[in-house]
């Protein structure tokens, strides 16, 4: 089974790119609440972003591999006023950047899917827990299940959240 964990609530800082945000300590209890829902003996991997690595540290005492390709959809801008509408544009037109400096969503899908394929191959028959990001997990689940990206689910993702896929 593949366990995709969206990171805990970040401490959002205007002027600082989201890839550098850390967890908001006020949300630690929400992260700890997921611990019992995750398999202790699984293979654990995380995005390199601080909020993802910090989430992993709160969820397991075991080793967690860091995989650069699990990072979120790359977004150079530190703050986008209409974030949800901009990401929805990325889903509607995945081959073009939805905002100046953003990675096309198709590139994110290809990068994350390749990385997860490698993890699953290396741990065939084992559970895997991956700590990462909402947009990346949404396109990954779409790819793994052969279904369109579930934008309603993406909008409803909590900090943290858990998606399971029989992979």
Model-flagged regions — what are they?
Residues 145-167:
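Domain-level recognition of soluble alpha/beta enzyme cores
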Residues 17, 22, 59-114:
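Phosphate-handling substructures
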Residues 9-11, 50-51, 71-72, 134-137:
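Short, solvent-exposed loop/turn segments at secondary-structure junctions
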Residues 46-47, 110, 131-132:
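Short beta-strand scaffold positions
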Residues 38-40, 119-126:
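Glycine-rich phosphate-binding loop signature in dinucleotide/nucleotide-binding domains
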Residues 58, 139, 143:
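Active-site signature of alpha/beta-hydrolase-fold catalytic machinery across serine-
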Residues 2, 42, 126-134:
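Generic beta-sheet signal
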Residues 1-65:
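Active-site-proximal alpha-helix that buttresses catalytic centers in soluble enzyme cores
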């Amino acid at each position: 089974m593949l366990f995709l964990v969206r990171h805990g609530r970040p401490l959002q800082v205007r002027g600082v790119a989201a890839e550098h945000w850390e967890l908001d300590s006020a949300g630690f209890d929400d992260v700890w609440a997921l611990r019992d829902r995750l398999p202790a003996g699984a293979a654990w991997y995380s995005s390199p972003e601080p909020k993802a690595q910090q989430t992993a540290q709160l969820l397991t005492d075991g080793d967690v591999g860091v995989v650069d390709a699990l990072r979120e959809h790359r977004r150079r801008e530190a703050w986008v006023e209409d974030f949800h509408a901009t990401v929805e544009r990325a889903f509607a037109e995945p081959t073009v950047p939805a905002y100046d400096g953003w990675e096309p969503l198709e590139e994110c899908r290809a990068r994350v899917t390749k990385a997860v394929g490698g993890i699953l191959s290396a741990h065939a028959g084992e559970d895997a827990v991956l700590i990462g990001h909402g947009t990346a997990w949404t396109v990954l689940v779409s790819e793994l299940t052969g279904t369109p990206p579930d934008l309603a689910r993406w909008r409803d993702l909590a900090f943290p959240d858990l998606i399971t896929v029989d992979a």
